[in-house]
């Protein structure tokens, strides 16, 4: 477990939380009521504020991910999925929702709109070589191991 500092812009909204004891990501809540027309009508997404700011420890990042239930039942996803939050970002977290359905989606303040997955990462130190070592797979990609 890692400690993450959080600032609530809107103290009436719950803190991001895990839906179950086995959940990997925390639910994020909408700070506003919103109306999200289908993508084909507006040609983009709608940026929704979550009402929180976080300070991730150095060496950690967070991904903002779609909620599977919203996607499956309503056609709602995230335009720039996954959204990446770096450890040095201190602004409010926003979610750029997109509506793939054919009907307008009406979201309510306090509804769960996305998930936040916090992960540890390592910085890369490149070592340039003239040729990479061979593997059994080689350069096989795009379904080369079967569908």
From Swiss-Prot:
Keywords: Hydrolase, Magnesium, Metal-binding, Nucleotide metabolism. GO terms for biological process: dUMP biosynthetic process; dUTP catabolic process. Pfam families: dUTPase (PF00692). It catalyses: dUTP + H2O = dUMP + diphosphate + H(+). Its EC number is 3.6.1.23. This enzyme is involved in nucleotide metabolism: it produces dUMP, the immediate precursor of thymidine nucleotides and it decreases the intracellular concentration of dUTP so that uracil cannot be incorporated into DNA. SUPFAM superfamilies: dUTPase-like. InterPro entries: dUTPase, dUTPase-like, dUTPase-like_sf, dUTPase_trimeric. The keyword Hydrolase applies. The keyword Glycosyltransferase does not apply. GO terms for molecular function: dUTP diphosphatase activity; magnesium ion binding. Gene3D superfamilies: 2.70.40.10. This is Deoxyuridine 5'-triphosphate nucleotidohydrolase. Belongs to the dUTPase family. Pathway: Pyrimidine metabolism; dUMP biosynthesis; dUMP from dCTP (dUTP route): step 2/2. Substrate binds at residues 67-69, 80, 84-86. It is an enzyme of class 3 (hydrolase). The gene is dut. Its cofactor is Mg(2+).
């Amino acid at each position: 477990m890692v400690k993450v500092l959080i600032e609530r812009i809107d103290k009436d909204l719950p803190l991001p939380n895990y839906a179950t004891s086995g959940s990997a990501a925390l639910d994020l809540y909408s700070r506003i009521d919103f109306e999200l027309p289908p993508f084909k009508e507006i040609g983009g997404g709608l940026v929704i504020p979550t009402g929180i700011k976080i300070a991730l420890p150095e060496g950690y990042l967070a991904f903002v991910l779609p909620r599977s239930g919203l996607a499956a039942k309503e056609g709602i996803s995230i335009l720039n999925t996954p959204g990446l939050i770096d450890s040095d970002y201190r602004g409010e977290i926003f979610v750029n929702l997109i509506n793939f359905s054919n009907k307008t989606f009406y979201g309510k303040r306090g509804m769960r709109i996305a998930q936040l997955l916090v992960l540890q990462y390592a910085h890369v130190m490149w070592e340039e070589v003239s040729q990479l070592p061979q593997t059994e797979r080689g350069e096989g990609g795009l379904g080369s191991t079967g569908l």
